Amino acid sequence: MIQFQVPVVAAGLAIIFDLDGVIVDSNPVHRQAWVRYNRRQGIETDEAMLEFMYGKRNDEIVRHYFGDHLEEEEIARHGAAKEALYREMMAGEVEARLVPGVREFIQANAGRPIALASNAEPANVEFLLEASGLRRYFRVVVDGHQVRNPKPHPEVFLRAADRLGVLPADTIVFEDSHSGVLAARAAGARVVGLRTTHRDLAGTALNVEDFRSLELAAWLRNQEPLRR
C-alpha cells in the first residue's frame, strides 16, 4: 500500500527520466560488471576508473579502460560483452532495485508526456523497461545510440522534448549524474537530482533521496508551464 502522497505535475509539463540511478538503482551492478569483465581482460579496476563510468556512453568507457587505439568493432565487442554480463547479473533483480516511489510516480503521471533519455545501451534500456513493466508509460525513448553527442551534450534531452512536442523549458528532468545534470541544464530543462549515485549534484533545482520526498512534492506543486 502506498504510504506517501504521490505528486502529479501540472498539465502542460512533461517528464523526462534518465534510466540508471533514476528509475533503477543499477549503478552498483554496473560497477560490479565492469570489475568482473575487466578482470577477465587482465585489468584491475580502481575507484577512479569506476567513477569515470557514471553518465557515460559505453564507447567512452571502453576507450578510457582499454585505450584510444581500439577499432570501432573491438570497442563495440567489449561494450556488448560487458552489457550481456550486466543483464545476466540484473536478471531477477530489477523490481528490488527500482528507486523507491518511482513506479507510483510514473503511474500517477501517466496522463502527462513521459520520456526516457539515457546514454544507456538500447538492449539495457529495453531490458529494464520491460522487466520493470514500465515500458507502456513512456511515449518516447531516446537511448545512447540515437544521438551523435552523448551527455553532457544536451542533444538527448532536446530530442526527447522535440519528440514529445513540448518546449525543453517545460520539461522536468530527473538525473543522478553530473554529466546528466549538465546536459539537462544546457537543454533548458528544470532538473531534479536523485542522490542514488552522488550525494550532492550542483546545478539542480533540488536534490532528493527518492520519489517519496515531501520536498519534491512541494516543489512540483509550484511548477507551471511557461505557456498555457
Identify the meaning behind each predicted range.
Residues E44, H64-E104:
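Metal-dependent phosphoesterase signature
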Residues I23, L98, I114-A117, N149, ...:
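Conserved SAM-binding loop
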Residues R31, V35, E47, E51, ...:
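An amphipathic alpha-helix signature
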Residues I2-E51:
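Active-site neighborhood of HAD-like aspartate-dependent phosphohydrolases
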Residues Y37-N38, R57-E71, L128, A161:
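Helix-loop "lid/cap" segments that line or gate small-molecule binding pockets
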Residues F4, E88-L116, P122, E126:
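Short, acidic loop-to-helix structural element flanking the phosphoryl-transfer center
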Residues R39, A110, R185:
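Anion (oxyanion) recognition and catalysis
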